[in-house]
From Swiss-Prot:
Involved in the transport of copper. It comes from Arabidopsis thaliana (Mouse-ear cress). Keywords: Copper, Copper transport, Ion transport, Membrane, Transmembrane, Transmembrane helix, Transport. GO terms for cellular component: membrane. The chain crosses the membrane at residues 52-72, 103-123. PANTHER family: COPPER TRANSPORTER 3, SOLUTE CARRIER FAMILY 31 COPPER TRANSPORTERS. It is found in: Membrane. Highly expressed in stems and at lower levels in leaves and flowers. This is Copper transporter 3. Induction: No change in expression levels after treatment with high concentrations of copper. It holds the Pfam family Ctr. It comes from the Eukaryota. The gene is COPT3.
Length: 151
């Protein structure tokens, strides 16, 4: 049926091995296990590149994103109060931003770079310590503060 009314045969899908060969020919390497090194790609094609300075910038960005995500998760920007559409929209917007940031961190960790993983966990840990733990929370002596959960 080739050649009938402008139809063309379907092109075969590229094999997984051809994808990895393409990445290798163009200088990129897709890791499937954790590795340590400054030459990696995180979130965007070619970022942070091969520069040690840009790698440290990348780690700092991942650290800040994960800490800020924890801040949004733990700070309780919307205290309990009367039901309102405006309050619900604001709460939904904050939740959506927090979810997006968390997914960005997850995708960054999927680069399998050990430094990115450590930066993400350190950011989440520091974010929890500042915004979720008892370390920086002012409480009265007769009240007990429970750690808020994500749910």
């Amino acid at each position: 049926m080739n050649g009938m009314s402008g139809s063309s045969p379907a092109a075969p899908a590229p094999s997984p091995s051809s994808f990895f060969q393409h990445r290798h020919r163009h200088g990129g390497m897709m890791h499937m296990t954790f590795f340590w090194g400054k030459t990696t790609e995180v979130l965007f094609d070619g970022w942070p590149g091969t520069s040690l300075k840009m790698y440290w910038v990348c780690l700092a960005v991942i650290f800040v994103i994960s800490a800020f995500s924890e801040c949004l998760s733990r700070c309780g920007f919307m205290k309990s109060g009367p039901a309102s559409l405006g309050g619900g929209l604001l709460q939904t917007a904050v939740y959506t931003v927090r979810a997006a940031l968390s997914y960005l961190v997850m995708l960054a960790v999927m680069s399998f770079n050990g430094g990115v993983f450590v930066a993400a966990m350190a950011g989440f840990g520091l974010g929890f310590m500042i915004f979720g733990s008892r370390a920086f929370r002012a409480t009265s002596s007769n009240s007990h503060t429970e750690v808020q959960s994500h749910c």
